[in-house]
């Protein structure tokens, strides 16, 4: 399938089937407008309690939607027809904290001791921004969102520690204020930004070179606005070095059956 094709109007079931059958492996930004998108972190059960506490201590970076029992591939809370081992466009596999490979399904890697954490994603508030008349640059340019490692520390928990990863979207000052107001309503999608303006204040030395995703144009009259990001666990995994871990690939999310509006507040 043409990865550049807009999928906003494609019914969710059809999009999920494309992903499940490896016919769509691109970024899910702008896809399935209005539906909650989610990051995944899959760990051996012996590491799960520490990571659960890590999520609870860091709700902006890791807004927990739900967690499975060991070996469970399905979560009724997010959708009746979701298979956590097949329904993400691309998974990243880590051994001892080091990235090993990218795969399109987990059929040969699944184990009965694996616990899956489903974490909210900022893609979930994109539709609310668009409906309010705001333009999202990476969607307009047909790109993945820009994501950066930062110097912002997470609160440590057990084996897990590390720094935030953030996503960035540029806005004029007036639109940035509106974006802050809107995204504050979505705490399960990272909520309000963690920073805006000078990227060097959070350890980003070259905003034109994201650590993950794609670079986008930032116009002279715009400021970069930074949100917590579900790639944070991947940064933490590199430091904490669990023997085995699987995550989604940055920008390539699990799309749930739940509406983003169900998780809105205010």
Swiss-Prot record:
Q: Note the superkingdom of the native organism.
A: Bacteria
- Keywords from the UniProt entry: Lyase
What is this enzyme's class at the first EC digit?
lyase
From the Swiss-Prot or TrEMBL record, what is one GO molecular function term? lyase activity
EC number of the protein: 4.2.1.-
Q: Tell me the first and last residues of the signal peptide.
A: none
Give the InterPro entries listed for this entry.
D-Glu_cyclase, Putative_hydro-lyase, UPF0317
Q: Which family does it belong to?
A: Belongs to the D-glutamate cyclase family.
Q: Which PANTHER family match?
A: D-GLUTAMATE CYCLASE, MITOCHONDRIAL (PTHR32022:SF10)
Q: What is this protein called?
A: Putative hydro-lyase VF_1377
List the source organism.
Answer: Aliivibrio fischeri (strain ATCC 700601 / ES114) (Vibrio fischeri)
Q: What does UniProt list as this organism's lineage?
A: Bacteria, Pseudomonadati, Pseudomonadota, Gammaproteobacteria, Vibrionales
């Amino acid at each position: 399938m043409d990865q550049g094709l807009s999928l906003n109007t494609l019914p969710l079931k059809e999009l999920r089937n494309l992903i499940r059958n490896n016919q769509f492996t691109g970024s899910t930004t702008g896809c399935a407008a209005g539906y909650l998108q989610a990051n995944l972190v899959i760990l051996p059960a012996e590491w799960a309690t520490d990571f659960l506490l890590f999520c609870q201590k860091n709700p902006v970076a890791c807004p927990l939607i739900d967690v499975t029992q060991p070996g469970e591939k399905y979560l009724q809370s997010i959708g009746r027809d979701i298979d956590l081992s097949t329904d993400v466009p691309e998974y990243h596999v880590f051994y001892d904290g080091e990235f090993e490979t990218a795969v399109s399904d987990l059929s040969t890697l699944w184990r009965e001791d694996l616990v899956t954490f489903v974490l909210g994603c900022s893609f979930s508030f994109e539709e609310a921004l668009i409906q309010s008349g705001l333009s999202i640059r990476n969607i307009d340019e047909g790109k993945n969102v820009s994501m950066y490692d930062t110097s912002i520390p997470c609160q440590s928990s057990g084996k897990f520690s590390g720094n935030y990863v953030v996503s960035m979207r540029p806005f004029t000052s007036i639109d940035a204020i509106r974006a802050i107001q809107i995204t504050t309503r979505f705490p399960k999608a990272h909520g309000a930004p963690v920073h805006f303006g000078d990227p060097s204040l959070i350890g980003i030395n070259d905003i034109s070179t994201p650590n993950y995703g794609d670079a986008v144009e930032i116009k002279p009259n715009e400021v970069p606005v930074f949100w917590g990001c579900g790639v944070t666990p991947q940064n933490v995994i590199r430091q904490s070095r669990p023997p085995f871990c699987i995550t989604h690939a940055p920008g390539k999310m699990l799309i749930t059956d739940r509406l983003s509006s169900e998780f809105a507040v205010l």
